[in-house]
Amino acid sequence: MAIRAGAMLATTAAVGFGTKIAATRGIRAIAAGNRATESAYAQAPAAATVSGGDGSAVSFDSLGLQGRRLVLEATDADTIKAVMGEPQRQPPVRVYVGVESAPSVEERVELAITELEKTGGFERSRIVVASPAGTGYVNYIAIEACELFARGDVATVAIQYGSLPSMLSLDKVSEASSLYAALIGRLRSHIDDNDLEISLFAYGESLGALSGQNGILEVSKQGSGPIDGALWVGTPTGSALFEELTHERGVPIFDRPSQLAAYIDEGNTVPDATLLNHDNDPVTKFTLSSFYSMPDWLKASDRGRGVHPAQRWLPGIAFFQGLIDTKNAATVVPGEFGSTGHDYRADLAVFVMIAFGFSDVDDEQLKNTEAQLRTSEVQRSLNIAEGKL
């Protein structure tokens, strides 16, 4: 018996060790994949208004897969003219600093400031500070919409903190939050110290919304009003700022564009922080406590759009169902924009327009923008399908 028990323990230990090795290798492979170079995004940009381009302080190779995609897809003058029916005011600026662009948080932040100076970012009327997801991904749709509405007169800046998907980057939230706080604080100081007439906006989606909100809360404790507005999309549970905004300040949570439009039509001003969370987004509702306790949203008489009225809570089962739903939440078809679950693509144009103060956009321009965003996404998917070098 003792020999058999010892053999079982040894087998269990071996399986556990092997699983750990396999998981570690898998994570390393994912990270390596997010540093790889794609065929369609292999050539450094020539423009002096994006990172990795002419005169840039950031090397193109250090941007990683997500950064290279972002800087190579800045909206061009012809597209702005075709969509908006007006000439470009200025070329849009896209600044991206990768995890390999500089070794420390402080150096990455300073590199971002230097890069904004070199690319002309501080000469734009708006700067959007994007809080990336775990891989370094910044939602291209939101940024392109912003560039179209601004007729190019906008700069976007983002600093990468990791190379793994959001579900594998939860241990990076604290680091990402501190990085975002440092960037926001440094930008606010630079704008104020130089008397620049620039509106500073925050943007984050999913894990980027969580870390971005934590960063805003952190820098707000050091002074008041670090930003001029924010758009937070699909915020996961656990954000202290989200709780403060909704429970203490009464900031509304919007499920869809029509709700935001109705809110404004009622005479309300645009919230300092515009919150977009779908009623049926599993990412915004998943909690560890759902394993043993019914969440509040299931107790509500009106569960909201897209939530099945017959959905029930069962101990343990609901937790794993939520985990599966969260994992599958980002499954989408390129160009077919949805407004459900964790797919916010159909909502973004309207929310960007209102949250960032683009009051000079008419219905035709909005319609054209939404069509262009779909076209761009289809082309992007074709580019990505070409594969890696």
Question: What are the functions of these language-model segments?
Answer:
Residues 1-198, 218-389:
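C-terminal His-loop and adjacent cap/lid subdomain of alpha/beta-hydrolase
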Residues 202-209:
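Gly/Ala-rich beta-loop-alpha elbow adjacent to hydrolase catalytic centers
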Residues 209-221:
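Short glycine-enriched nucleophile-adjacent loop
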